[in-house]
Structure formats: structure tokens, C-alpha cells
Amino acid sequence: MIMNLNYREPIYLARYLKVMRDRLPSQFLISRSVSLDFNKDSPLPELWGLHDDAMKSFRGRMEFVSSMHDLPPPAVSSLLDLKVAIANKILENCHFCERRCGANRKKKRTGYCRLDAVSRYSAEFLHQGEEPELVPSHTIFFTGCNFRCAYCQNWDISQAPRSGIPILPQELARTITLRRAYGSRNVNFVTPTPHTHTILKILNALKVNVPVIWNSNMYYSREIAGLLEGVVDVYLGDMRYGNDECAKKYSNVPDYWNVVTRNFMKAYTGGEILLRQLVLPGHIECCTVPIVKWVKENIPKIRFNLMFQYRPTYRAYEHPEINRSLMPVEIQKALDIVREAGIEDVLI
């Protein structure tokens, strides 16, 4: 990790920092302390009704818990158990992401992400290359993706859904515990959306307090947004495109702007946000400008990471206009846009 002499500790990740230092419990531990009885075989609408009621108890408990000592013990049957049950049912008609393919992944049918019910990861390690406030970050790279980014730097992982190591939730929970003992500041789930069912099971088996990072393209369904509240501490979210046309052209994503802004708004009320804006060559006016404007007007109290790491990889050559690195003038223009907008908590 290269030291940034201009680095300032984030303003709007205050709760995360307290969880990281074991001064507050992670949200998933609070959910696991909320007791409720339910039948996992009940119809999905009935389970959602119970979930909505239990989330009211969760929110009240979140306000009450001001230290680790305030955390009640795990419930025999908990809100987190209910979240696991709901995610497991959604697998039968998959709508984890907003493509809403409807595949029965339990029967090995697949949708756009090409994943069945078995989650796999390609690597897990203490990552030193994330944002300074996150490192060392216990980063777990899941295989598969619901995007098809032409310039994906991890294309060998994202486009090979059947590669990697099959996940046994209890085993990975033990690995997370070990990494935490070795100094990880968080557990960082990368490309998590298609694996929501598995991640909830991992957290339900986890015994250690650790901040949960949802490292995502933010293109998940309303239902998944509801499950993530009460589980995720920091939404490490990409906001790449300022319009639907660019999203469709470079990532084959429909209705990008509505879905992603909706999910950022929901995350803003239920957790903390570290937003990544990867500046694309030739896309200052169409993407960076509207993103910065929207953030300032709608979710101003977030950590904003303006990123200049774009490199033309994978199939970027199919789009000559992005088959190059950023020019210095583009970098300076993006910096000026963010500064003039007055976004307060910026990482560059």
C-alpha cells in the first residue's frame, strides 16, 4: 500500500470505525439478537410480513445499543435466521438482482449470472489495496457477476461462475474468525449479490464481531435491499454510469440509473456508504457530472472515492473510445467537478 500524505480519516464512516475497534457490534449481531418464531416453510409473503415487523424491533435495538455490553445474547430463533430462510426461498425463483431472471437455482437452473445454488469463491486474503480505512481487509472474491463490463479487470473471475472453491458457510465463518484474529479490519464480500443466500448463512455461523462490507455494483432487487438492512455495515458501492445508455453499452445493464440510485438511497438510511466513482475516459460530462450532482443533492453524508485507476482491459478494444487510459486533463476536470460540488468527505 502506497502512503497517501493527503489522507484524512473518513467523516461519515463513524459507526464502521467503532465496530472495527470492537466498540459497537456489527449489524448482523444485532439482528441475531432479535428473537422471533417462524416456520421456514411458510409462504414467502408471510415470511416478509414477519420480517417487516421484526425490522422495527431491530431499528429500536440499533438505537439502544451504544456499546458491546448492550448487545443481548443470540436468540434461539432470530431475525437473521428469518433472513436466511427468505433468501433460501428466493433461490427458487431468483430475483436477487434487478434482472429478476426467475431461475430455480436450487434445481441447477441458471439465469444471467449463470450461477446455481452453490456459491464459489476464487480467493480470500488480507487485502492491502483497498481504501486506507479498510485495510487490511479480509476480502473474499466470489465468482460470477450480473454485469458484463467490457473493461472488467477481474473478468477471469466474474466470467467464470463455475470456477473457484465451493463454499461451506461454517468453514468460511471459521476462516473469517481466524483472519479477524490476524488483524483484519472487516470482512469484504466482493460481487456478493448472486450469493446473498450463502453470505447470510456465513454471517449466521460467525461468532466474532467484524464489520460487514458489501462490495457491490448496487444492482440488486428491492427485496435484497430489505434483507441487507440489519446485516451490512458499509455499502462499498460502485456508481459508474450517469445514465442508462452508457450502462447498457459497456455493461449490458438495463434501467441502471433508477435501480442503483434507489439502492443507494435505501443504503443511506440503513448503513454507511463508501461510494466508488471510477472515472471512465471520455465520460466526464455524461457520467461523472450527473453522479456528483446526484450524490450532493441526495446522499451528501457519505465517503466519496474518486477513482482514476481505469485501465483498458478485457474487451475494451471493442469500444475504441474507452480503449485508452485517462488523460491528465480528464483527471483534473473530474477533481474540479467534485471540489466545486462541495462534497465533504472525499478520498482521492
Predicted regions and their residues:
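Generic secondary-structure signature for well-ordered alpha-helical cores
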Residues: 99-102, 150, 154, 265, ...
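A cross-taxonomic marker for long C-terminal extensions/tails that follow the last structured domain
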Residues: 337-348
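N-terminal alpha-helical interaction blocks
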Residues: 1-80, 86
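Conserved acidic residues
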Residues: 95, 150, 233
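Long, charge-rich boundary regions
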Residues: 124-167, 175-194
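Conserved AdoMet/S-adenosylmethionine-binding subsite of the radical SAM
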Residues: 169-322, 328
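Short alpha-helix
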Residues: 327-338
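N-terminal [4Fe-4S]-dependent radical SAM core
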Residues: 60-142, 154-161
